[in-house]
Amino acid sequence: ESGAAIEWFLEDQSDGMTDRLEETVATSLFRIVQEAINNAIRHALAGEIRVRLRDKGGRLLVEVMDDGIGMDRQAQRIGHGIDNMRTRARLISASFAIRKNTDGSGTCVTIHLPPEMYEPIGG
């Protein structure tokens, strides 16, 4: 480990959607994000990690982006906790994707939850 500082940012534009998740769903989502951050630190040599939570048409969209070395397709298929992230996402009926950031650098892990995962407001 290099001991280099990592800048990290949390952008919550979800309008409180995370507060309405069922506890098991929230825990699974937390674990996926935790694994994505760990991968960025351990394998991607990232200097910056950004977690973004957004309300996208009534569905929670979570993105974990880093500015690291990126990940080739082979690495996506084997190890790095990716199977665990995929499985956790499947268990909460979320879509899961790994791709390069839109600017071509680093990696972006995307989790998109379906609308039925939220408890009603005031419920």
What role is predicted for each listed range?
Residues 1-123:
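Coiled-coil dimerization/phosphotransfer module
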